[in-house]
Amino acid sequence: MKVLLVDDSVTMRRIQKTQIQGLGINDIVEAGDGEEAFRKLQENMPIDLIMLDWNMPVMDGLTFLKKVRADNSFKNVKVIMCTSESEKTRVVEALKSGANNYLVKPFTPDALKEKLGI
């Protein structure tokens, strides 16, 4: 499995990367905002999963998600929103925009494992 990890916080990316690697997944590409993430998505296909923060500079996670879902070449890429946005309307908005799942930060390795289905 190849993962694109998108978060503007280097610390948060480091924490999430460690959690992902703890599940035996080591093919991880990182990006600090939605614009960089879209470039890296195009350059590193096939990507199986995008773990996506909501609040980022340049291009936020929801805008990035909508851009990914508008491009048919990425239709099979799974997206998990990993964000501190826990308000129900925000969760619904992300899922309606094409997220496959949603994790509220901070989350445990077990919660991540459950969302990944492994």
Annotate each predicted stretch with a short phrase.
Residues 10-29:
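Two-component/phosphorelay signaling modules centered on CheY-like receiver
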Residues 17, 63, 86-101:
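Alpha4 helix (beta4-alpha4-beta5 surface) of REC/receiver domains from two-component response regulators
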Residues 30-39, 61:
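Helix N-cap/capping motif at the beta->alpha junctions
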Residues 39, 62-75:
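Short amphipathic alpha-helix used as the core "switch/output" element in two-component signaling
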Residues 45-51:
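Active-site beta3 strand of CheY-like receiver
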Residues 56:
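Receiver (REC) domain active-site loop signature in two-component systems and cognate sites
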Residues 107-116:
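C-terminal output helix
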